[in-house]
Amino acid sequence: MGILDTIRNPQDLSKLTEEQLSQLAAEVRSFLIGNVSQTGGHLGPNLGVVELTMAVHRIFDSPRDSIVFDTGHQSYVHKLLTGRQDFSTLRQEGGMSGYPDRGESEHDIVESSHASSSLSWADGISRARQLTGDGDRYVIAVVGDGALTGGMAWEAINNIAADKRRRVVIVVNDNGRSYAPTVGGFADYLASLRPTIDSFRAAPAYEGTLDWWKRKLQNGGPVGQFTYRSLHAMKKGIKDWWAPQGMFEDLGMKYIGPVDGHNLQAMEHALSTAKNYAGPVIVHAMTEKGHGYAPARAHEADQFHAVGIIDPETGVPTEAGGAQSWTSVFADEIAAIADERKDIVGITGAMLIPVGLHKFAARHPERVFDVGIAEQHALTSAAGMAFGGLHPVVAVYATFLNRAFDQLLMDVALHKAGVTIVLDRAGVTGPDGASHHGMWDMAMVQIVPGLHLAAPRDATRLREELREAVAIEDAPTVVRYSKGNVGAEVEALERLSDGVDVLARRPAGSSENDVLIVSVGAMSELALDVSNRLGAQGISSTVVDPRWLLPVRKSIIALAARHRLVICIEDGVRAGGVGSRIRQEMRAAGVDTALNEVGLPVEFLDHGTRAQVLERVGLTARQITHDVVAQVLGTKVPFARPLPGQEHPTTGSLPKL
C-alpha cells in the first residue's frame, strides 16, 4: 500500500515525515499521469501544483479555512488529498467533476471554472466571516498568473487590500502560462520577480524585528516618527531595487516570495509566515506546468494543459486522429482571408491555439493580438480597431462571451462597429460540465440591435458564412460552431432568394405540408433524421437551414405559414432562443402556425459526452419524433390562417394512418 492510499482527509498529511511527504508527492504525480491519461483532462496544470497544494492543506485547516481554486481545473491534487481517489470516472457522466464540486465534498467551496473570479469570492467570504464573528478563519485563493491578466482579479485586490484585518491569503501559482505563455505588462512584471527568490524576507525573525522597531520608533515622539518614515522610505527603495515587488505592497498587500513552488518546505514556511501575518498577503509561488512528466515539459504548445486519452509513457494520443475539427476549418479559412485582406486582424483571450488563430498569427504575427484573459477588453478594443479602419475577428469560447455582453451591446453594437465574433465550443460541449457548455449565446445575442448571427451546419458553410460575416462593416456579426469534429457535408436541395437552404422535402414532390423543421447549425443531421422518421409515420416535412439566424429571414415566415406545425431544433436554451425569435416574427407577420422550441432547458447541465447530455434533455431524433407525431396525429395543431392576400390556407390535410 502506498502513502496516497492512506490519505482520507487533509489532517492525515500532518502525520507524515519529510521523507514520506516527498514520497507522497511522487505518488500523486504517478497517480495523475496513470489516471488522467485514461480519461482525459487537465494534466499539466495539476502536475505543477502538487507540492503547492500539499503545503496549503498542511498549513491551513480545510474546510474551516476556505480554499478557493481559480479556474478550478488545477484542483485534482486537492481532490486526492480530500479523499477522492476514484479518478476512473473523472469527467464521465455521473462521475467525478473536472472542477471543484460542492456535491462531492465539503472541502469544495466554489464550483469555479471561469478565470479571475477567485479573489472576488475570497473578498466576499472574508467579509462575511468578519460580520458573523468568524474573522479568525482564513480564506486562501489559489490563482494562476494567467488569471491575473483578467481585470476582475484587480478589482478584487483593490477591495481586499483596503482592510488590513481580513485573513486572506492569495497564492499566486506562477508558471508563466495560462493555456499558452502569459502575455502583457503584468506578465512582464512577474517575470522580473522570478529570479529573486528571497528566503530572508520570509523569515519570522525578519518580520519580528521590523515590527519591534516600528513600534519603538512610532512611539518615540516626533524624532522617532521622522526616523521611522525615513528608514521605511529607504527600505522600500532598497527592496524595489533588490526584489521589485513594490506594486503589491503599494496596494497595501504584504508580499512574500518568489518561492519555489516545488519545494514543499519552502512553501510551508512562506504560508506559515502569511498565516502569522493575519492580514491580506500574497504568496508568490513559482511552478512548472507539467512538472515531473517529460512528455508534458517537452510539449511546447501547452505543456499538456488538457489532454485526451494518451499513452502514459510517451504522452502520444491513443485515440484515432486525423478527423477535421470545426476549429481547424476556421483556422485555415481565417488565415486565407487574412492573406487576402490587410484590414483583417485577430484577437484572442489567452487561447491562440484552442480557438484556431495560430495559423493566422504564424503568417501575420503583427495582426494577431493576445489580450490575456480579458474578454471585456477584447470586445471594446475590437470596436476601437473597427473605428480605425480594421475589421477585427474576436475568437473566444462561447461560454466566455457571457462576460463581455455589455461591451458587445454598448461598445460594438451601439456604435455599429464591423466586428466579427467567432464562438468556438458553442452548444453542448460535454466533459467540462455546466460552466463550459456554450448554451447561452444565442439567447443572449437575440436582444442586441442590428447583430447578425450565423450557425454553419458543416465545413463548407463555415467557410462561406465566415466570409459573409467579415464583409459586413456596419454591424457586429457572430459565427458559432460546435466542439469537436465536423460532420459530413449536408448539401441543400436549393437556396432561397434570402439565403435560406432547403435541405429536404419529404416525401419528395408531396403537396402535403405538415411540419416545417428549422435546423440550427450542427443540428442538421438530427433534423434530417427526424424528417425521415416522420415520413415513416406518413407525416410530410420540409427541413430548412436558415444559415443566418439573425435577422430572421422572410422566407422562414412564409414557409411557416404554409405548414401546420413548425419545430425549431437548436442546441441553445429554449427560453429566448432562435425558436422564440421566429415565433415573435411569425406573430408580427400575422402567422399563427404552432411552433415548438426544441432546445435545451434553462438548467445547469452536468458533464457527460455531447450525445449523453443531449439524450438526457430529450434532444434525440426518437424523442422529437414521438412528440411531433403525438401533436400532428392527435390533431392538436390548428390550421394556419392564409397569408395576407390569400383566400385559403395552403397547409395540407392530416395523414390517415
Swiss-Prot record:
It is an enzyme of class 2 (transferase). SMART domains: Transket_pyr. Thiamine diphosphate binds at residues 73, 113-115, 146-147, 175, 293, 375. Its cofactor is Mg(2+); thiamine diphosphate. GO terms for molecular function: 1-deoxy-D-xylulose-5-phosphate synthase activity; magnesium ion binding; thiamine pyrophosphate binding. Pfam families: DXP_synthase_N, Transket_pyr, Transketolase_C. Its EC number is 2.2.1.7. Mg(2+) binds at residues 145, 175. Keywords: Isoprene biosynthesis, Magnesium, Metal-binding, Thiamine biosynthesis, Thiamine pyrophosphate, Transferase. Residues 91-110 are annotated as: Disordered. Binds 1 Mg(2+) ion per subunit. InterPro entries: Dxylulose-5-P_synthase, THDP-binding, Transketo_C/PFOR_II, Transketolase-like_Pyr-bd, Transketolase_BS, Transketolase_C. The keyword Transferase applies. Pathway: Metabolic intermediate biosynthesis; 1-deoxy-D-xylulose 5-phosphate biosynthesis; 1-deoxy-D-xylulose 5-phosphate from D-glyceraldehyde 3-phosphate and pyruvate: step 1/1. Residues 101-110 have a biased composition (Basic and acidic residues). The keyword Magnesium applies. It catalyses: D-glyceraldehyde 3-phosphate + pyruvate + H(+) = 1-deoxy-D-xylulose 5-phosphate + CO2. GO terms for biological process: 1-deoxy-D-xylulose 5-phosphate biosynthetic process; isopentenyl diphosphate biosynthetic process, methylerythritol 4-phosphate pathway; terpenoid biosynthetic process; thiamine biosynthetic process. GO terms for cellular component: cytosol. Belongs to the transketolase family. DXPS subfamily. PANTHER family: 1-D-DEOXYXYLULOSE 5-PHOSPHATE SYNTHASE-RELATED, 1-DEOXY-D-XYLULOSE-5-PHOSPHATE SYNTHASE, CHLOROPLASTIC. Homodimer. Catalyzes the acyloin condensation reaction between C atoms 2 and 3 of pyruvate and glyceraldehyde 3-phosphate to yield 1-deoxy-D-xylulose-5-phosphate (DXP). This is 1-deoxy-D-xylulose-5-phosphate synthase. The lineage of its organism: Bacteria, Bacillati, Actinomycetota, Actinomycetes, Micrococcales.
